Structure formats: C-alpha cells, structure tokens
Amino acid sequence: MTDRKFFIFLLFCFSILFISLFYKSFNSPILYFPDYNQLNYFINLDDIDQYLYDDESFDCTEFSNLFVKRFADKGFFSCTAELNLLSNNKSFGHIIVAVYTLDKGLFYVEPQTDMIISDKDLILNTNYCNLVSWSCNWTIKKVSSCFGVSY
C-alpha cells in the first residue's frame, strides 16, 4: 500500500470514528442535577398529581415512573425511591421519587400530591402520612434509592 493510500485509509477510519462519537454524543441524553427552584418549577407545571390512583392500573409506581420520565425529558436526573412502611403490624412498600438538588441536597417527592420532602424529614420510625398530609399511620422502616439506603 502506498503512503497516499494508507493516509486516505487512516483518514477514512478516523472520519468514521469521529462521526460515530459525534453522533452518539448528540443522541444520548445527558441528564443534570437540578437546583431546588428548577425542581419546584417542574412540580408546579406538571400535572402528574392530577392523575387518579388505581390499585390495578396506576398506583404509586406508575406515578413515580411517570415523574422520573417527564423530569428526564426536561433534562434532569431523578430516580425512584422505595419506602418500607409498617401499619397495624403489616409491612408494605411505597414508591416515591428521589431528587438531588445542587444547592440544597437530597429531596424526595410524593408525585401523587406534589409534596417535596427533605431527606432530613424522611427519617426512620416517623409517620410518612404526616409528611404528605394524608390521614393514615405509616411508619417508615427503610428508605432505599439510587442515592443510598437508610435502615
């Protein structure tokens, strides 16, 4: 192979590599951590809390997954968080959303009510219902999300 053909071959290979990297960088979403105002702004505009809860087709998991998807569509990272709760000596789970804000740290969102809960308030052995203004008694036994686990 002559030097000229080799140079053209290398140029072709690098062009393909560059185009594939360039294409990938613009077609893979990059998600950012929001600040608290961006989180609050999103919650005020979004209508997820207006959906009707249904045990069979739209429960806490669907509320939370829809929040995470729509928040990502706006360019922000969040993840679901599982709460292990206790009520009347029965254990059960509940799914909410965890969001790390750049300026104020970790928060949790109850997407059914749009309540924003500080990680300092979502502590073990407290009544979750008091945090979201529901009339029930669900004692928090564990909080698990992509940001960490509390037992």
How should each PLM-predicted stretch be described?
Residues 3-151:
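A structural boundary/capping signal
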